[in-house]
A protein has these predicted regions:
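Feature captures hydrophobic
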Residues: 1-227
Length: 227
């Protein structure tokens, strides 16, 4: 468990674009924009194409490493991110159960977080949806796995995503899976949702029309992740 800040940046249209990860004793939060505090390490890319190609795995050209206060951060952070990107860009589920669980966990973290970030970045459809929403929670869970859960809370234009199950009250809508294969089948769009629903391996708790709406936003995030 580490504590520090890892920043990723590149120049764009005369400005510096950046995002950073804040590590706090095992907890990780994603922040848009440059860090107000000096990063523990910064990965500075030449441009947006270099950034995208590196994390898509189509280029092994390394970025510049700046503010390197702890060399032991660099390799595990980069290797971990590349492994995450490989899993998130996969089109077929992995064979072993451990990697399946890791892929589901990453997607359950990515999708709510991605929707929240699109709202904060001003995506028109997401912003409109968030502004019109009362206080609601949308959740993703796998039965029997407390570690495989994530949610997004929406209220009057503001969004916040988090890992784990939402326990303060019953979520407004929950997409519940009975097993890893059912979850990956839906997340990777390789399974028939109607068939999984009929088999009771996919259970939608809440209003279906709102589930379809949040599902569209999840697909949007997935498309961005694989570009």
């Amino acid at each position: 468990k580490k504590t520090g800040i890892v920043q990723f940046s590149f120049p764009h249209e005369g400005d510096k674009w950046a995002t950073h990860l804040v590590f706090d004793e095992g907890d990780i939060s994603v922040k848009l924009g440059p860090s107000e505090d000096e990063p523990t390490v910064e990965l500075a890319f030449n441009d947006i194409d270099h950034f995208n190609a590196f994390f898509k795995g189509t280029s092994m050209k390394l970025p510049q490493f700046r503010h390197v206060h702890h060399l032991n951060w660099v390799v595990p952070v980069v290797m971990g991110l590349l492994k995450m990107q490989k899993l998130l860009s996969a089109s077929e589920p992995p064979a072993d159960e451990e990697t399946k669980a890791l892929m589901v966990k990453l997607m359950f973290y990515l999708l709510p977080s991605g929707i929240s970030q699109l709202n904060k970045a001003g995506h028109p459809e997401v912003v409109k949806w968030a502004k019109m929403s009362p206080d609601r929670v949308y959740a993703l869970v796998v039965d029997g796995r407390d570690d495989l859960a994530g949610y997004i809370r929406v209220k009057a234009g503001k969004t916040r995503s988090a890992r784990g199950a939402y326990k303060r009250s019953q979520p407004f809508f929950t997409m519940r899976f009975t097993d890893l294969d059912a979850a990956l089948g839906v997340l990777l769009q390789t399974a028939d949702m109607l068939a999984l629903t009929a088999q009771k391996r996919l259970i939608m708790e809440g209003a279906p029309e709102f589930g379809a709406q949040i599902g569209d936003f999840m697909m949007l995030v997935g498309q961005y992740a694989q570009k």
